[in-house]
Amino acid sequence: MQANKNIQKLTPYLSIPHKIWNSSQSNILKLDWNEATIPPSPYVIESIKKFLVNGNLNWYPNTKNLYLLDKIAEYTKQINSSFVELFEGSDSAHECIIDVFLDKCDKIGIVSPTYDNFRSRANGVGIETISFTLDDNFNLDFDSLEYFIHEKRIKLLYLCNPNNPTGKSYNIQKIKSLIINNPNVMFIIDEAYYEFTSQSVCDLVEQCNNLIITRTFSKAFALASFRIGYIISHPENIESINKLRNPKSVPMLSQIAANAALEDLQYMRDYVDEVSCARMEFVKFLNTLTTGGGGIFNDSVANFVLIQNENISLFVGFLEKEGIFIRNYSHLISKNCRISIGTRNQMSYVAEKIQEFAKKQGGFHLV
């Protein structure tokens, strides 16, 4: 039986084969999907162990974990728990938002290049997506974006801040003005990397019911395997979303892990500080390695950097043979790759291997 017409013509979200799971993982440095490079907080490990021994594993998960929702609201310092809902990661939140707020005739605007799953999901259900492309330096022209919204009659705009894959953070006041000035457009602000910047539009959700923020525990909190995230939005939107959202979808172990992580915020903050230091040192190394300028986008504020190289496939393959997995982004940005940032010790090892590559190639050649 054939898939429906939308799926037949869909360009899928391009993931990568996970060779890591088919090899020995003891000597691997996974820097391809922007996960944390350290284990979760010891609080998380201990809480999971306790639940495995004493919890009701034969029950469905808590469908309205008020304690966890309150903890998240407290963490935001802006709202109460009526503005929060849990999801099994940001992806499922994006999928639910598309299904709840859009009709087939609506148009989605996507600030690109960006995380591509939102586009894939929308196209998969027959909704048109239109890209608003950043300039050559990956800067965002807000006046042009507002014109684009009106000209294309955009119903929903997806904006990742900080941007993935560039790591750039956009002017938060200009984002807020855009949301306030366009009350008939739904804005999805993907704040997956919020912890690395502390910049948010969360203070707008009480006054603006055209705003949904998506966040995740997969990055700074080191809970990627648990697949848990949350949205922040006006209670009216939460009510609409919960008409479709499956309340049993977030596993109990994931809820336990998220709650424990929020009880040890210092662990997360220490890791974020370490990554910030490692990123600055790594970018400094890259800039000394290259000649001719350009190529290294040193204004990333997140836990990754985007770099370019003339022989990007060769570069990615070389690091993979050394047990370092990074993300080839050539399908979206020609001859570019994204490298997640770990600890200073980890990135020192990566720098050593990149230096070996450059020596073999007679330099680190930019495009």
Swiss-Prot record:
> Which GO MF term does the entry hold, naming one?
transaminase activity
GO biological process per UniProt:
capsule polysaccharide biosynthetic process; nucleotide-sugar biosynthetic process
According to the UniProt record, list the residues that bear N6-(pyridoxal phosphate)lysine: K219
Query: Which Pfam families has this protein been placed in?
Result: Aminotran_1_2
Q: What class of enzyme is it?
A: transferase
Q: Does the keyword Transferase apply?
A: yes
Instruction: List the pathway annotation.
Output: Capsule biogenesis; capsule polysaccharide biosynthesis
Q: Which UniProt keywords apply?
A: Aminotransferase, Capsule biogenesis/degradation, Pyridoxal phosphate, Transferase
Biotechnological application? The reaction product of this enzyme, serinol phosphate, is an important precursor for serinol (2-amino-1,3-propanediol) production. Serinol, in turn, is an intermediate in the formation of certain drugs, such as the anti-cancer N-palmitoyl-2-amino-1,3-propanediol, and the orally administered fingolimod (sold under the brand name Gilenya) to treat multiple sclerosis.
EC number, UniProt record = 2.6.1.-
Instruction: Name its co-factor(s).
Output: pyridoxal 5'-phosphate
Tell whether Transferase is among the UniProt keywords.
yes
Question: What is catalyzed by this enzyme?
Answer: dihydroxyacetone phosphate + L-glutamate = (S)-serinol phosphate + 2-oxoglutarate
Q: Entry's SUPFAM superfamilies?
A: PLP-dependent transferases
So what does this one do?
Answer: Pyridoxal phosphate (PLP)-dependent transaminase involved in the biosynthesis of amidated D-glucuronic acid structures found on the capsular polysaccharide (CPS) of C.jejuni. Catalyzes the transamination of dihydroxyacetone phosphate (DHAP) to (S)-serinol phosphate in the presence of L-glutamate. Less active with L-aspartate. No activity with dihydroxyacetone or L-alanine.
> What family is it from?
Belongs to the class-II pyridoxal-phosphate-dependent aminotransferase family.
According to UniProt, the name of this protein is Dihydroxyacetone phosphate transaminase Cj1437c
Q: What is the lineage of its organism?
A: Bacteria, Pseudomonadati, Campylobacterota, Epsilonproteobacteria, Campylobacterales
